[in-house]
Design a protein with these regions (language model features):
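Active-site histidine-anchored catalytic micro-motif
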Residues: 7-114
Length: 114
């Protein structure tokens, strides 16, 4: 598989790259206040029906603003909330650059309001 690295593993000071929340807040896609965000997430998951008893191998979930996709994302995550996983791989599209290959973040972390 060919990949394209976006070189976001570290900065000039050789400190790990931290991607800060880009769309949190009152006019964003999700709340910036931890207590409000946690309450929203719990309500979406708790309000969803459990589909089956077996452990899902994969999960497809929307990633739009919670006002648009919260109930659907809650249903998806409700299916895995009772299980633990050793490895989780998150795959998402690029919204800003058209990529011919896969982009992989070699190191770093995503910061959330939580």
């Amino acid at each position: 598989m060919e990949t394209t690295s976006m070189h976001c593993g570290s900065n000039e000071d050789n400190k790990p790259y931290i991607r800060h929340p880009a769309v949190a807040g009152p006019y964003g896609f999700y709340p910036s206040k931890p207590d409000v965000l946690l309450n929203d997430i719990r309500s979406y998951i708790d309000g969803a029906e459990k589909y089956g008893e077996s452990k899902p191998f994969g999960l497809v979930s929307p990633h739009a603003g919670y006002v648009y996709s919260g109930p659907v994302a809650g249903w998806a995550y409700r299916q895995i909330v009772d299980f633990s996983y050793k490895t989780v791989i998150v795959i998402s599209p690029s919204h800003f650059v058209r990529l011919q290959k896969v982009s992989v973040m070699p190191a770093g972390a995503y910061q959330t309001p939580l």
